[in-house]
Amino acid sequence: MLRVLQECEHVAADFSADPVHDLRVSLRRCRSLADGMIAMDPDRDWKAMKKAGKRLFQRLGALRDVQIMMEWIEKLRPAPARADAGESPALMETPAQKSEMSDGAPFAEPVTTDFGDPAAHLLLEILKGRETEQKREARAALAEFDRKQWRQWSRSLPLRAARIRPGSAVFKHLALERWTAARELHVRALRNRSQVAFHTLRIGIKRFRYIVENFLPAEHKAWSNDLKHMQDLLGEVHDLDVLWATALACHVFPDEASRKSWHAQILEERTRRINEYREKTVGPDSLWVAWRAGLPQGKQIEATATLRMKLWAKALDPDFAHSERVSRLALDLYDGLVAVGLLQFANADEARSSLQIAALLHDVGKSEGNKGHHKTSFELIRGHSNPLGWRPEYLLRAAIVARFHGGALPSRSHKTLRDLLPDELRITIQLAAILRLANAFDAVHDGHIRRVKIENSDTGKRRTNGFLRKPAKLPPNQALVIEAEGFVAGSTTAQAVAAERYLLETVLRRPVVVKAMKAAVPRGDGAEVKRIAS
């Protein structure tokens, strides 16, 4: 982030092409850092920094576009060589081949020698006029940029980013999200081959590249050259498209022959770059396949998505240890109820995961105050972007279940539930009933209820006469008995449990009884008692 302030000083000197480019690159990297951290750290400074960087970045964009077109004119239609001058360095490289960070190298303006091509000369003169105008706009934008605030962020935000180790699984999951989005843009661009599609693809690759660069050092070392080259190829395609559109709009061609000559040259350069991109990104050995191989696979995707959401919740929840305990207790209840046949789901694993996430996130709303926090939790969870590996309705279910961990009981007429299909409504209320009771078991946030168990249930299959058999279902109308380790009758926790078990009783259509869990007696001690008695 300090590099942005350094580049601001360079740009303020003369607003030439290289420092403007370097400042925009620095801003883009900071914005990409913020974009990645926002997914796991809800601190508002990330969003504020990203917004401030975006404002300056965009206001420098028009100037940068003009300067790029001037460089391309020099490359495509160079001035006639003079006998007393060697080849201009500016003509020996494309704009995208220049270094992204100049490391203090002297800044050089594009060569403005007279061109033999009248169209090139006229277009360059028009662009020089625009450059002067855009430099005034850029100077105003730079003056409005709050460097003092940026310096404060440069001290505080890197410390927050350091809490998550670079190269960790959560960053690989974030990179996979960017890879997936960019890959879809790649397929679309190769299918319709439009200018907009290739430009959007370049942006997608750029976002993937900066996540890798900022957060995955090992992958960056292996992939950086290829990622930058693919981005540069597509960037040059976009530059050529903009140059051609500008030349047409400015009516710089003196005749049809000149227009056709320009079009043919631009089309040739454009096609060559697209073909090179295709060669490296299509087929079983493509770069896309190589990049995907280094990112999470299979079940790792959903597990890492859960870890990302836990990190997000931990930053918001003032007592996340309580939420973790509630999650464990809720899963104990869920597994026991399924084992005795009182709950049945078409997709039991998904329902269990929904309950786990709802329990972990149920108190994130307390970041904005305790009053009505269950409603705030619902809004925060629902407003969170859907992590890769989860379906959108999966996160919405978790948000609704978390909404009803306290406050009013869920009903079909509630505005949050009225649009749910009958099966989804039933599942959501069942999970909310479990979470509500699990939360009551840790009502005082002290963790003295260590575990719970459905009496006479066995979460595994029992072996009888050499055969595995499922546990017997509870008979109709028989009370559900829950044993809780550390439960004390008459305590504050017992009162909370008595109040919150009602929803589960309604769902199961049977009474729920909670009692203290009996201490297990080791087998050896029991045998010793028998010998003494005899």
Listing of model-derived features with the role each one plays in the protein:
Residues 2-9, 180-183, 187, 310, ...:
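Amphipathic, well-packed alpha-helical segments that form the structural scaffold of globular domains
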